[in-house]
């Protein structure tokens, strides 16, 4: 189950940070939100007054080959991955916005007032049944991680992964071998659940929630009989405090941003691309170009630092356009990791099949050798703001 889009598209970074502060000013989340608000102001001045780090071109060319050579150099030791629903679609999990196949286009049977209601906290508290029916269809544990997930696992194994910031709630990063310390699950997770009552907040494990969902029993707290909700971020809820606290330190020392499978439309997650030092290279692996901001809006609203793939001033951003799995295979081949990656996927999928008793590989995530496409060129490709991931 992929990202639940926990803020409306028209919300700005500042508005979301303020929401995080207002939600609980005495909590860790409130403190983290305050730090994020200061970071927002610092970012605004940095973008408008050219303060902070200097622009230095670290890529010898703005291609996938250039990124691979940089990754093999001593300059690249810490990689941050920013990922969205597009890295899980090959596992059989729908994204949210793709026409006809996206989740929002396939919710008619739940008789919602509008598609987004299924992830609104106010609607959930009154009508939890649609969400739990959907959760049964897309429950974590029914899918296997993709090549993208295992590419991030390779980064971890090789000591290159600083952090993975994920918008997804499908827990596939964990199944692939990333640990709690490796992850910032920006939109929450199914891994734990809590009673929605503010006076109770009893915690329940994944196994408890799974049993309730698959028995088609609306989960109720054993202590107070209030609803129990997975710890995913609904519309109307603040992002986890960990998102803001990790952001403060991680982006000061990152050497490469690897952005995969996201349209970068949802704030404040989308603003993460602007948090890195001005010299830090950024690679986008996605079906469409994303993250290209309007310079005027960036200056006025503090959302600067957008991707620049095509202008004469471009110096650090590279777009590889296509399926995320194929992009990771292409990059792995350039790094000399392709066989290692394919072997890892085969081995891990076989282990998952053995544990589940299935014994039959899932064709949607099979890592059978495929001819990697040539690295995508940087031809212009129009991306509208509302295009799907």
From Swiss-Prot:
Tissue expression: Isoform 1 is expressed in heart, liver and skeletal muscle, weakly expressed in the cortex. Isoform 2 is strongly expressed in the cortex, weakly expressed in heart and liver. Weakly expressed in several malignancies including breast, liver, brain, kidney and prostate cancers compared to normal tissues. Weakly expressed in glioma cell lines compared to normal brain tissues (at protein level). Widely expressed. Highly expressed in heart, brain and skeletal muscle, while it is weakly expressed in placenta and lung.
Cofactor annotation comment: Binds 1 zinc ion per subunit.
Active site: 187 (proton acceptor)
Role description: NAD-dependent protein deacetylase, which deacetylates internal lysines on histone and alpha-tubulin as well as many other proteins such as key transcription factors. Participates in the modulation of multiple and diverse biological processes such as cell cycle control, genomic integrity, microtubule dynamics, cell differentiation, metabolic networks, and autophagy. Plays a major role in the control of cell cycle progression and genomic stability.
Reported effect, residue 168 to A: Abolishes deacetylation of alpha-tubulin. Inhibits deacetylation of histone H3 at 'Lys-18'. Inhibits the block of entry to chromosome condensation and subsequent hyperploidy cell formation in response to mitotic stress
Chain intervals with Basic and acidic residues compositional bias: 376-389
Domain Deacetylase sirtuin-type: 57-338
Protein name as it appears in the record: NAD-dependent protein deacetylase sirtuin-2
Motif Nuclear export signal, residue numbers: 41-51
Induction annotation: Up-regulated in response to low levels of glucose and anoxia-reoxygenation stress. Up-regulated by trichostatin A. Down-regulated in response to high levels of glucose. Down-regulated by histone deacetylation in several tumors.
Reaction(s) catalysed by this chain's protein: N(6)-acetyl-L-lysyl-[protein] + NAD(+) + H2O = 2''-O-acetyl-ADP-D-ribose + nicotinamide + L-lysyl-[protein]; N(6)-tetradecanoyl-L-lysyl-[protein] + NAD(+) + H2O = 2''-O-tetradecanoyl-ADP-D-ribose + nicotinamide + L-lysyl-[protein]; N(6)-hexadecanoyl-L-lysyl-[protein] + NAD(+) + H2O = 2''-O-hexadecanoyl-ADP-D-ribose + nicotinamide + L-lysyl-[protein]
UniProt keyword Metal-binding present: yes
Residues that bear Phosphoserine: 23, 25, 27, 53, 100, 207, 368, 372
Annotated binding of NAD(+), by residue: 85-89, 95-97, 167-170, 262-263, 286-288, 324
Activation/inhibition comment: Inhibited by Sirtinol, A3 and M15 small molecules. Inhibited by nicotinamide. Inhibited by a macrocyclic peptide inhibitor S2iL5. Inhibited by EP300-induced acetylation.
Phenotype for residue 280 to A: Reduces deacetylase activity
Enzyme class: transferase
GO CC terms of this entry: centriole; centrosome; chromatin silencing complex; chromosome; chromosome, telomeric region; cytoplasm; cytosol; glial cell projection
EC number: 2.3.1.286, 2.3.1.-
């Amino acid at each position: 189950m992929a990202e639940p889009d926990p803020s409306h598209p028209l919300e700005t970074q500042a508005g979301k940070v303020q929401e995080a502060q207002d939600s609980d000013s005495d909590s860790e989340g409130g403190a983290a939100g305050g730090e994020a608000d200061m970071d927002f102001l610092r970012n605004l001045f940095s973008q408008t007054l050219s303060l902070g780090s200097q622009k230095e071109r670290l890529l010898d060319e703005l291609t996938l080959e250039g990124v691979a050579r940089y990754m093999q150099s001593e300059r690249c030791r810490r990689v941050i991955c920013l990922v969205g629903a597009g890295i899980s679609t090959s596992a059989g999990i729908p994204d949210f916005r793709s026409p006809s196949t996206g989740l929002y286009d396939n919710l008619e049977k739940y008789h919602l007032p509008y598609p987004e209601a299924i992830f609104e906290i106010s609607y959930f508290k009154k009508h939890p049944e649609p969400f739990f029916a959907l959760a049964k269809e897309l429950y974590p544990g029914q899918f296997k991680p993709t090549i993208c997930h295992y590419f991030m696992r390779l980064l971890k194994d090789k000591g290159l992964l600083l952090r993975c910031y994920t918008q997804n709630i499908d827990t596939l990063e964990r199944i692939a071998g990333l640990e709690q310390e490796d992850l910032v699950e920006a939109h929450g997770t199914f891994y734990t659940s809590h009673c929605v009552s503010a006076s109770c907040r009893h915690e329940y494990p994944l196994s408890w929630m799974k049993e309730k969902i698959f028995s088609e029993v609306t989960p109720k707290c054993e202590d107070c009989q209030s609803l129990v909700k997975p710890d995913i971020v609904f519309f109307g809820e603040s992002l986890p405090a960990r998102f803001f606290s990790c952001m403060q330190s991680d982006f000061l020392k990152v050497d490469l941003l690897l952005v995969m499978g996201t349209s970068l439309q949802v704030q404040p997650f989308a603003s993460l691309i602007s948090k890195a030092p001005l010299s830090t290279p950024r690679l986008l692996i996605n079906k469409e170009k994303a993250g290209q901001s309007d310079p005027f809006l960036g200056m006025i609203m503090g959302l600067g630092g957008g991707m620049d793939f095509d202008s004469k001033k471009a110096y650090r951003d590279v777009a590889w356009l296509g399926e995320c799995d194929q992009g990771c295979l292409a990059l792995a081949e350039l790094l000399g990791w392709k066989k290692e990656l394919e072997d890892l996927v085969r081995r891990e999928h076989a282990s998952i099949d053995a544990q589940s008793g299935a014994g039959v590989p899932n064709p949607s995530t099979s890592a059978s050798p495929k001819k990697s496409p040539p690295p995508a060129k940087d031809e212009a490709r129009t991306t509208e703001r509302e295009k799907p991931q």
